[in-house]
Amino acid sequence: MPALKVGNKAPDFTLPDETGNLVKLSSLKGKKVILYFYPKDDTPGCTTQACGFRDEYPSIEEAGALVLGISPDGAKSHTKFKTKQKLPFSLLSDEDHKVAEKYGAWGEKSMYGKKYMGILRSHFVIDEAGKLVDVQIGVSPKDSVRLATDAVRVA
């Protein structure tokens, strides 16, 4: 699958949130969405990214947008993480990483000299028409929050 670029239509998906409710991206048309992929609940970088979006959430809402976090973790892990960090947005479970693959957010990583496949920290800002207005793959947690928040304000 070719890499997603600004101007492309965001691939549709349906995933369960932390309560088991299904979230379908296309049902959010008419709203701006910050969709971010992160490797694992309650780990340092992922907590930094999630809490960054939490702290910016009032200005994100003011811009007419919402945030959806996606990782391979299940509902129980998401519920615990969301509660612990007081996150005001939904966390979606992509346990088979099919949605991450669609978005190019699944790829080869390396830790301590070992290569493995995993989530590449990424975000995608989607406008009201369902088009991508910002695409960042392999972004740092702090840069992700800043860049996505800036993009959603001008989208």
Give names to the regions the model predicted.
Residues M1-A155:
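Chalcogenol-based redox active-site neighborhoods
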